[in-house]
Amino acid sequence: MLKVEPIPAFQDNYIWAIHDGHSAAVVDPGEAAPVEQFLAQRGLALGAIVITHHHGDHQGGVSDLLARHPSGPNGEPLPVIGPQGERIGHRTQAVREGDTVTLRHPAVTFRVLDVPGHTAGHVAYVGDLPGAGPVVFCGDTLFASGCGRLFEGTPAQMLASLDKLAALPGDTRVYCAHEYTRSNVRFAQAVEPANPDLAAWAARVDILREAGTPTVPTTVAHERAVNPFLRSRESTVRQAVRAQGGDVSGDAAAFGALRGWKDGFR
């Protein structure tokens, strides 16, 4: 049986730890110290490092972790998995869509999806974990009620990436890498103020955050219901974008206008 737990880092990052009570794989360790503390508190060995994209707040802790854990639980070199199309330090396995990642400590298998947009070579890892069920680790592509900024990709690329994630089974748990939900929900409500699912979710987010509790993971089905970036083809979203002066002449144009609105939203 596997557990997935968040390791808070920086101001709003989540490093995800997948563990079996003995060893852990960590996803997007932007800094090492919180990971070391988590491992020590739970008596876990570090078994693998998994990276979704090249930004420093997702891989900045790899060097320090390898200095402390050069080998895995059985003495083999510690695996560092990362996207083929990006600059990933210390990477031992480069992956792209269609590849399978098989970890030993803990025993985990992922299939890889290419999800460019936030960065050019961003990937996501999809699996069905014993005890945790279907999961996707999606870095900064899909957030709870939002999506990542387009630093390197185009609106068409990001829309295609989000379509790919939205097509996963509805009960897939979405493990994103930031606690941006409150601000994302404020924007989503500006886009779809009459969405009842969103209203209920906004109230829930306030309760969770006031208690200091993460709002993630959510599920793919939940995101389809409340996330404007998965709903950019809906008439309500198109009307809101048009009211802001956005171009809704096509799917990519409407998505780009929606993303541009969010970029300037306060």
Curated annotation (Swiss-Prot):
| Superkingdom to which the source organism belongs | Bacteria
Q: Which Pfam families does this one have? A: HAGH_C (PF16123), Lactamase_B (PF00753)
For this chain, one GO molecular function annotation is: hydroxyacylglutathione hydrolase activity
Which residues does Zn(2+) 1 bind? 53, 55, 118, 140
Function, as annotated? Thiolesterase that catalyzes the hydrolysis of S-D-lactoyl-glutathione to form glutathione and D-lactic acid.
- Family membership: Belongs to the metallo-beta-lactamase superfamily. Glyoxalase II family.
The protein here is known as Hydroxyacylglutathione hydrolase
